[in-house]
Amino acid sequence: MAFTGTGQVSSSTGAFEQMAYFALRSNPLYEMIADVRSTAQTHNGASVTFDIYDNMAAATGALGEAVDVVPVALGDSTAVVTLVEYGNAVETTAKLRGTSFLNVDADAANIIGYNMVDSLDQVVAAVAAGGTNDILPTGRAATVNIIAGDTITADQTRTAAAKLRTASAPGFENGNYVGMIPPNVAFDLRSQTAVTDVIAFQIRQDGQAVRNGSIGTWGGVEFIENPRAHIQAGAGAAGIDVYDTVIAGRQALAKGFSRAPGFGEQPQIVYGPTTDYLRRFVSVGWYHLCGYSRFREACLQRVESSSSL
């Protein structure tokens, strides 16, 4: 008796899922703290300069009845944002588009769109972490002295909020500051169990934050766990990584961009022209002419720590 099985015919094949899956992604978050934008730009240029007037010293002395005041000169400072080009692109071939069971063009546009926000958010993260105000672990004089056991403490975050308030840094919603914290560091902050620490506070509330495994708003800071948070690779003692938690108020960062026709505040998706003779090659990419800079150093605090994970 002759059986007809998979070895006798070619109609038995492996199947493919026709929906494409993409690599895991995180949301772009740093752009939100670059809230200063040019609104009355004089002309198109390679940089955008923002002028900031200084406050006058308080006049607390009593005036003499017959003595005129002495005029005081005003002072100012500037923040300069240099515009640079950012972008990326992919190009597909006609043979791929004609033989793939997936919609390659649509998938390429999807991937390019995420690459755009991912890339720009990392640019902003590096600028935010480059501020001059840092809060080191107790007993450490510099980043290079941070050891593996120097995980973040509640005191460091409270110190950051206190310094921002001392500098009159304006807050975001409900007057709270925003803290971009690496997930590894957030784990360490939630692991502390003293009565003045995060987890003890949350347990005394309704416990929802504990169930969610999030910090939320605490100590005047709305913490957002961000995998793009800046890491100083190998910058600590014995080459350990140092993690930066950036705590910011409003006007911490500024964004500049070109206002010329065809440019703008937001990046753009660009479909390239088909220029080969047989029109086989199709490209899609993104482009942005912009720049980011720290606008008010007093509105930024960087908490440095190691991670136990």
Q: Regions from the language model: what does each represent?
A:
Residues 1-82, 300, 304:
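N-terminal "assembly arms/tails" that initiate or stabilize quaternary assembly
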Residues 2-33, 147-158, 191-309:
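Sequence/fold signature of self-assembling virion shell proteins
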Residues 47, 174-178, 281:
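Short, surface-exposed beta-edge/turn micro-motifs
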Residues 57-61, 188-189, 232-233:
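Short, solvent-exposed loop/turn elements at domain surfaces
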Residues 73-100:
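Short acidic, glycine/tyrosine-flanked loop/strand segments centered on an H-E-D-like triad
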Residues 94, 181-185, 193, 288:
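Short, structured patches in soluble enzyme cores that scaffold and shape functional sites
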Residues 99-169, 302-304, 308:
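Alpha-helical scaffold segments that mediate packing/assembly in large oligomeric complexes
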Residues 165-182, 187:
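Extended amphipathic alpha-helical segments with heptad-repeat/coiled-coil character used for oligomerization
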